[in-house]
Regions:
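N-terminal glycine-rich phosphate-binding loop and ensuing alpha1 helix
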Residues: 2-70, 85, 119
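Short beta-strand-to-loop acidic/aromatic patch adjacent to the donor-nucleotide binding site
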Residues: 119-129
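Short phosphate-binding loop-to-helix
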Residues: 70-119
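Hydrophobic helical membrane-anchoring modules
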Residues: 263, 278-280, 284-312
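Conserved core of the sugar-phosphate nucleotidyltransferase
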Residues: 132-221, 225
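A short, conserved beta-strand element in the Rossmann-like catalytic core
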Residues: 13, 129-131
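A C-terminal functional module that forms or caps the active site or interfaces directly
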Residues: 232-267
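Short, surface-exposed amphipathic charged segments that create phosphate/polyanion-binding patches used
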Residues: 91-103, 168-173, 285-289
Length: 312
């Protein structure tokens, strides 16, 4: 069965000193974080990659990774496709609000793929390193898809303490699960910081401790082709319910929408636990740590010095 990896790479990179953080080189040979995610996905069995980008970064993106990955994937019988997240791509009858410059969010990003997604797929962020285990587990879940399982999703569940930055606050989906390992709620939580005790939410310099051992969503979801129509319907509802005060800032976020479907009893989400340590370039200061982390993974034999050599 064909399975697709969707990579959300349209982010502006506002926290990374003005640069396009998804394209920052971190590997021995100039690889970026996406290279490692693509390698791990192909190794796990995914055979199609969809890049979600903006048209205004298309040339920089193709120069940094797109053209190179296309050549590698051609030799591995892995399909490459592009989708473009644009502010003006809105439901029929909806006009772009005057003054709106902020992207519509991760739900809108995935919706940009509707013309190129016809199979079970995983969604990831471009600037997060997830580790190999999660890709294997998501792939093995997705290949069991049948149309009767259209509303059965999955999610990679990371341990919160393994997903924090040393250099500032992060946003994570804090998850609740039942005894069978299914997601019961996901709470999008901002301003999570690392503390000597574990983790806390920083609200105007007042710290509120949270459980560092809880599951966190890193926007790594396993979804079905039928979800695309559901996602489009949800985007229309998002506009119908959006007040004038939210028109310039409101976002259609994937974890929040999936949680709404969960609470309505419309879907199930199996949490696939992973003990791999996340890292990523949320802040410019994170880059040195990420570079050293990849060098250590290569030294330990997790990756080859020439990254894709072992897939040939």
């Amino acid at each position: 069965m064909r399975t697709t990896l969707v990579i959300m790479a349209a982010g502006i990179g506002s926290r990374f000193g003005g640069g396009i953080k998804q394209l920052a080189p971190v590997g021995l040979n100039g690889e970026i974080i996406m290279d490692y995610s693509i390698h791990d996905a192909i190794e796990a069995g995914f055979n199609k990659i969809v890049f979600i980008i903006r048209k205004d970064i298309k040339d920089a993106f193709k120069e940094a990774i797109g053209d190179r990955i296309e050549k590698i994937c051609n030799n591995l019988d892995v399909e490459i496709a592009y989708a473009y997240q644009e502010l003006s791509e809105l439901p029929e009858g909806v006009e772009l609000p005057t003054g709106r410059t902020k992207p519509w969010g991760t739900g809108h990003a995935v919706l940009a793929c509707k013309e190129v997604l016809h199979e079970p797929f995983a969604v990831i962020n471009a600037d997060d390193y997830y580790g190999k285990e999660a890709f294997v587990k998501l792939h093995d879940f997705l290949v069991c898809y049948t149309p009767e399982k259209a509303n059965q999703f999955c999610m990679a569940g990371f341990i919160l303490k393994n997903t924090l930055s040393e250099n500032g606050a992060v946003t994570r989906g804090i998850c609740e699960t039942n005894e069978e390992g299914y997601l019961t709620a996901v709470h999008e939580t901002s301003n999570i910081v690392k503390t000597p005790e574990g983790a806390a939410v920083d609200n105007d310099e007042q710290l509120t401790s949270i459980n560092a051992e809880s599951y966190a969503s890193m926007n790594m979801w396993g979804l079905t082709p039928e979800f695309m129509q559901t996602l489009e319907d949800g985007f229309k509802e998002f506009f119908a319910n959006m007040g004038d005060k939210d028109i310039l800032k409101a976002e259609y976020l994937l974890p929040i929408y999936i949680d709404e479907l969960l609470q309505a009893g419309k879907v199930s989400v199996k949490v696939l636990d992973t003990n791999d340590k996340w890292f990523g370039v949320t802040y410019k200061e994170d880059k040195d740590y990420v570079v050293k982390s990849f060098a250590k993974l290569i030294e330990d034999g997790v990756y080859q010095k020439n990254l894709f050599e072992d897939l040939k």
